[in-house]
């Protein structure tokens, strides 16, 4: 992000990033392993994707700080996903993906992850689950020179 931000600022261009995941996830109903699984997913998102370590859930706050440091006017706002039982396909894809990331990171045992995933899928199949996934939109623009 630093190289992109430096180039944008050097050209005095505006910058907009939509739906930057910020690490906030809440489940209804909750499960004792939610925080551990989501923590593992956040660690997974920070892994090197071929360009060095990724920012993962820190991307929005780092982007805000970077543009403020170069004198840009920055506006940001929550743009959370709120997924309800009728969003079942998306909910299933999310919990499956989070479980997969947790398995790759290896901070929890495979039986713990399987138990968490079974609990989440069961709640989804009975339409008793909703999830809020925190995102932030960021707009940055150079302050006009006089």
Model-found features: residue ranges?
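Short glycine-/acidic-enriched loop or helix-start segments at secondary-structure transitions
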Residues: 1-2, 27
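A short glycine-rich, Lys/Arg-flanked "PGG" loop and its adjoining helix->strand segment in the class I
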Residues: 2-16
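Short, well-structured alpha-helical interface segments that form or flank functional binding sites
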Residues: 3, 58-62, 135
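Short, surface-exposed, charged loop/turn segments at secondary-structure junctions
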Residues: 6-9, 29-37, 87-95
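A general structural signal for short secondary-structure junctions and capping/turn motifs
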Residues: 7-8, 65, 129-130
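Conserved catalytic/acceptor-binding region of the Class I
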Residues: 13-78
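Conserved Class I S-adenosyl-L-methionine
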Residues: 70-146
